[in-house]
UniProtKB/Swiss-Prot annotation:
Protein topology in the membrane: Multi-pass membrane protein
Annotated localization: Cell membrane
Transmembrane regions: 22-42, 53-73, 85-105, 114-134, 143-163, 165-185, 202-222, 240-260, 271-291, 294-314
Organism: Chlamydia trachomatis serovar D (strain ATCC VR-885 / DSM 19411 / UW-3/Cx)
Function: Transports S-adenosylmethionine (SAM) and S-adenosylhomocysteine (SAH). Allows bacteria to acquire SAM from the eukaryotic host cell and to likely remove the toxic by-product SAH.
Name of the featured protein: S-adenosylmethionine/S-adenosylhomocysteine transporter
Organism ancestry: Bacteria, Pseudomonadati, Chlamydiota, Chlamydiia, Chlamydiales
Keyword terms of this UniProt record: Cell membrane, Membrane, Repeat, Transmembrane, Transmembrane helix, Transport
């Protein structure tokens, strides 16, 4: 029953994106980031119960199958146009499979503060990918908004993080390089998805996501079978695994991935990546609300810079015609 309600909620959110109300779309962007920020804790729980690659593969395959079921119920076309086959395979390998594998391996050797800082560069990599793939122009005003976002990140990490700044290590080792690579590949994947949505209008974003998730999930499970111990499967706590995977599939794969993909039809990947910088701030809120952690003192300042940067980028992209009020 909970899963059915969540799926109905996801469909409602995705429908609202294309109503001619930009305020509602902006609200959905930040609501999506708010929901997505819970996936870190859920992923940690899942990895406590099973091997990381098996977790990734299981959730991707399960989510893809559920999406295919929803599309069949809605009687949407699942036929892949020939020009879309290779881009979807590329999206599956780069945007889903490699991104998740590199992220999981890199996070095992990094502190949360360093990981958050590296993820803070995603709007810059998204802007570069948009320039290369979609020929979207990066203006000085947009760079100013991105810089404000970076300032907000520095304020949050220096004055609002949960770890002592003195404990930070700034050496560039293998974990840092893996996470930087995951950030770049993720930005490339979202830009490729936006490009696919433009060129293959006969195929819905949900269908593209379904194909990409199943392909990436199968690759992850094959990788897991080669590198992780299956006896008979790499799961130590079946109940916790099922609970965590179920929550991840519903909140991350079904709601957030698909809503983000829908939003890419109306907004650039640069703007959406910038808005997703608030995810660590929302994670701090969850920590304060659910775990009783102290409220970070730099949080309000970071949010203030984030709002200013968001307005700059939004108005500039609206002027450039990259923001659509309706489809």
């Amino acid at each position: 029953m909970v899963a059915v309600k969540a799926l109905l909620f996801a469909c409602t959110l995705q429908t609202c994106v294309f109503k001619p109300c930009c305020d509602m779309a902006i609200f959905l962007i930040f609501l999506n980031a708010f929901i997505w920020s819970s996936s870190f804790a859920l992923s940690k729980s899942a990895m406590e119960a099973a091997a990381p690659l098996f977790v990734t593969g299981s959730r991707m395959v399960l989510a893809g199958v559920v999406l295919f079921g929803l599309l069949l119920c809605k009687r949407e076309s699942l036929r892949l146009p020939r020009p879309a086959i290779m881009p979807i395979v590329l999206l599956s390998v780069i945007g889903f499979y490699l991104t998740n594998v590199l992220e999981f391996i890199g996070l095992q050797g990094l502190s949360s503060s360093t990981a958050c800082f590296i993820y803070g560069f995603s709007p810059f990599t998204a802007a570069f990918c948009s320039y290369v793939q979609l020929r979207e122009v990066v203006t000085w005003k947009k760079l100013g908004g991105l810089s404000l976002g970076l300032v907000s990140y520095l304020v949050y990490l220096l004055f609002g993080g949960s770890e002592d700044v003195a404990e930070w290590g700034w050496q560039l080792g293998l974990p840092e390089l893996l996470l930087i690579a995951a950030t770049c590949l993720s930005s490339y994947g979202w830009t490729l998805l936006r490009k696919l949505g433009r060129r293959c209008e006969s195929l819905s974003m949900t269908a593209i996501n379904a194909y990409a998730m199943v392909i990436a999930g199968v690759l992850s499970l094959i990788h897991s079978a080669v590198t992780e111990v299956w006896n008979p499967v790499p799961v130590e706590n079946p109940l916790l695994f099922l609970q965590a995977i179920g929550a991840l599939v519903i909140f991350s794969n079904l709601i957030c991935y698909n809503l983000f993909a829908k939003l890419l039809r109306s907004f650039s990947s640069t703007f959406l990546s910038f808005c997703n910088l608030v995810m660590p701030l929302f994670a701090s809120f969850f920590g304060w609300l659910l775990l009783g952690e102290s409220f970070p003192p730099g949080l309000l300042f970071a949010v203030g810079f984030m709002v200013l940067g968001c307005r700059l980028i939004y108005h500039e992209e609206f002027r450039q015609g990259y923001v659509l009020t309706s489809e």
